[in-house]
Amino acid sequence: MTFKHYDVVRAASPSDLADALAQKIREGWQPYGGPFSSYTDDGAALIQAIVAEGDVSTPVVVKPTGGEGAVISATSDPGYYFVVVLAGQSNGMSYGEGLPLPETYDRPDPRIKQLARRSTVTPGGVACKYNDIIPADHCLHDVQDMSRLNHPKADLSKGQYGTVGQGLHIAKKLLPFIPANAGILLVPCCRGGSAFTTGADGTYSDASGASENSTRWGVDKPLYKDLIGRTKAALKKNPKNVLFAVVWMQGEFDFGGTPANHAAQFGALVDKFRADLADMAGQCVGGSAGGVPWICGDTTYFWKQKNESTYQTVYGSYKNKTEKNIHFVPFMTDENGVNVPTNKPEEDPDIPGIGYYGSKWRDSSATWTSQDRASHFSSWARRGIISDRLATAILRHA
């Protein structure tokens, strides 16, 4: 049996789940496995995977230009894109160590694309060139290539390669709020271990972007040239494309540099980015580069516990900048005050019922992302609370 579509149904109670599943079955879906419990910003939730062999008629509510919401098919091909740039360091990219689930929870969507960087769409897959528009999946084409760091339990024949990021899931949560004929184009520009006040500059080429050994942010440095170059390339793909937001998650490696200089250098980078986009203002949300929000995500509890004062110096500098259209999104805890899960093995357990294996299987430097396991958010956090809060912030401020 070959399945063509994968999705999930979420509900707050068994009766709500039954009603939602009944509707999905009428649309051509069928349950896949059994339901399990999870936790979101709204509290406990029941989640059921669903699959379909043929075409489905899943309706979604989209935001029209005026009037009531309209119900449309979720499988239409995009005619243009809302561009979302992803930049910063490791927690902004695919550093979730739990097993990727591309057939279910990390299933790509035909309306979500990315700008290519690597020579193939997936390892050993279809060839692509730098800045081509290609499908987006769980392990995006960032400056640092995470596609080679496979989970010990991965079945590569199922596409379970690499590590898990939040980019795809941010885009999935934005889709219901954009026009039916539009898609999301992700522009991945993150580099793990990068900082403003320490690190190597690396090199930059118009043909391939920043070199993988580039770990220094700053105005006109290779990582910046990569960021602005790929953003412009995404907009030039179609005059209808709109720059929707920049999602920025960075600061951890400035703990070991000169933290007091971080805020000024970040501010200068944002100013330069907006100035360099002045000639494309008509393709920016709000009609100007300054109208494009910078959504700045928090880090894990590990870094705050490591050095509280340095955490406040670096991450506190993202706060109280709403007048500059820079917005901080907290991730230290969930709505119940519980630490947001990380790659620490006890925070990322196996779920055998859905074929999920957590981070404990990455038990050496050959497979883990860092020996400080709590320094990065887990795969489930990226699928859930991280992407939930980032997508909400984009919709609120764009």
Predicted regions and their residues:
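Cell-envelope and extracellular/periplasmic
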Residues: V62-A398
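Terminus-proximal functional modules
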Residues: M1-T65
